[in-house]
Amino acid sequence: MASGVMVSDDVIKVFNDMKVRHQLSPEEAKKRKKAVVFCLSEDKKMIILEPGKEILQGDVGCNVDDPYKAFVKMLPRNDCRYALYDALYETKETKKEDLVFVFWAPEEASLKSKMIYASSKDAIKKRFPGIKHEWQTNTFEDINDPCNLAEKLGGSTVISLEGKTLKS
């Protein structure tokens, strides 16, 4: 079921900037987004950037010690959101960096919110070509555990996320 919700040009630009990993100057690299949260506009007709809900690569190691935990803290407890998270992880063979599309639909969200976000998900996914990993999660218990994200990224072959060794 399509909701008729549109995706703002700003959302598409952020996706394209996060997806393309070309050679950046050190200053440009610091401004690259590590994580960003999207929400519906007040009139529920447009998917937009949620103001103030982003982590820049330059924040990591400075005022953000654990980017994954900081990302989780940006999500509301009682409403749905979409997000992009640029995951840096290591498998038994190599280090990797992949974008993950997250659909956050907490159990505490209203039924109306869950329905409109679920029916609008395809609108945003169609504007994000090439995303390898999609994760729908419904509880803070699930999203708080980085092992659950690691499972989406490669299962038992993932040994660390954001430089932190995962528990087996």
Swiss-Prot record:
GO cellular component: actin cytoskeleton; cell cortex; cytoplasm; membrane; midbody; nuclear matrix
Domain called ADF-H: residue spans: 4-153
InterPro entries: ADF-H, ADF-H/Gelsolin-like_dom_sf, ADF/Cofilin
Any single GO BP term: regulation of cell morphogenesis
Localisation per UniProt entry: Nucleus matrix; Cytoplasm, Cytoskeleton; Cytoplasm, Cell cortex; Membrane
Pfam families referenced in this protein's UniProt entry, alphabetically: Cofilin_ADF
Residues that span the membrane, as ranges: none
Motif annotated as Nuclear localization signal, chain positions: 30-34
Post-translational modification: Inactive when phosphorylated. Phosphorylation levels vary during development. Dephosphorylated by pdxp.
Coiled-coil regions listed in the entry: none
Xref: SUPFAM superfamilies: Actin depolymerizing proteins
Keyword terms: Acetylation, Actin-binding, Cytoplasm, Cytoskeleton, Membrane, Nucleus, Phosphoprotein
Chain positions found as N-acetylalanine: 2
Described function: May play a role in the regulation of cell morphology and cytoskeletal organization. Binds to F-actin and exhibits pH-sensitive F-actin depolymerizing activity. Required for formation of the cleavage furrow during cytokinesis.
PANTHER family: COFILIN-RELATED
Family per similarity comment: Belongs to the actin-binding proteins ADF family.
Protein name, UniProt field: Cofilin-1
Species name: Xenopus tropicalis
Gene name, Swiss-Prot/TrEMBL: cfl1
